[in-house]
Amino acid sequence: VVTPDVVVVGGGVVGLAVAEELAGSGRRVVVLERDRVGETCAAAAAAGMLAPAAEADATPPVTTQLALESHRMYPEWVARLESASGMSVGFDRSGTVVVGLDADDLRELVHLEQAQRRFGLRTRRLSAAEARDLQPSLGPSVVGGLLLEDDWQVDPRRLLQALQRSLEARGGRVVEGAEVRSLRRQDGTWRVSTRGGDEVAARTVVVAAGAWTPQVLPADAGPPLPVRPVRGAVLRLGAGLETARVVRTPRVYVVPRAWGETVVGATVEERGWAREALAGGVYELLRESRRALPCVDEMPLREVAVGFRPAIRDNVPAVGAWDDDRTLFVATGHYRKGVELAPLTAAVLRRLLDGGDHPLSSYVDPRRFGRAA
């Protein structure tokens, strides 16, 4: 039986961020990942936009405030990870251009701008010509837009690798192919059994298994956590744009990487655990992206990536203790903001595991859905 100080269930971006942070505090940490890191987690099919401004009108105010706090942490957090891992995570602060293709789109941008100003976010209106100056790949259909200088991007797949490297450099360990079969408390210790027959025992467990979290939590630990999978597909194209600025319309986003890749997303499909991407969804992504960026037509289609976002009933993440003894914690419900909220989530859980509190922990307390036994 392996006996670390903390077991983290889930090797996605949230689980690895939490594990890496806890390992930095001197704890012995083991991460149990059901597949291979980056294979089936939501981040593997994410574009990596850090976009509190672009999504200010479609996100609960509490979640936007959380995103802004995490956003402030990002530059220093990324710099530390890149130094520890010896690799770039594709962090780019070129900003985002949100464009409209007709009068209806421009009206939506007015509402978006109003939401942004309520949060004190920087935004600047653009004419069609100004938008094309900032992203020369834009086509003639663009009639106006907004420049969001504080909406950035990171490559989630590289971020996962960097987190794992930094975790291991801090003495942590990732066990792949370790799907959790049961989680039970015995003599003050949590015993985590995998489907492969292995067992890990620890005083503290953090379940950060994304959409799978409710399946991992023991039934007698409290009421069901209202998290469900929402499938999303993105397209990976084998060429970049003329600049690394992200392009968004009200219907699609296009994220160019500096090294010659472009990610187009994303579908939102309530279809349970079915993994296959639908042709109709792929068609819509291509149709909408090429309306703004005709050059998409000439790009090689390299991959259709599918992931399951952990959606939660009130669209506010659940991060904190799930039992009264503060030995079982959860970190899930981030939906489309797991990459963006990873540093804040890790900081909140470290503070809680240290026996303290975090100024934002009350907003994300998972027991708001019903007190655990």
Predicted feature residues:
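Active-site substrate-recognition segment that forms the wall
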Residues: 20-25, 34-35, 48-50, 87-92, ...
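N-terminal Rossmann-like FAD-binding beta1-loop-alpha1 element of flavoenzymes
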Residues: 4-31
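Dinucleotide-binding Rossmann-like beta1-alpha1 core, especially the glycine-rich loop
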Residues: 48-134
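Helix-loop-beta segment of a Rossmann-like dinucleotide-binding subdomain
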Residues: 87-100, 112-113, 119, 123-170, ...
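Helical element adjacent to the flavin cofactor pocket in flavoenzyme catalytic cores
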Residues: 146-196, 200-204
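C-terminal catalytic lobe of FAD-dependent flavoproteins
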Residues: 295-373
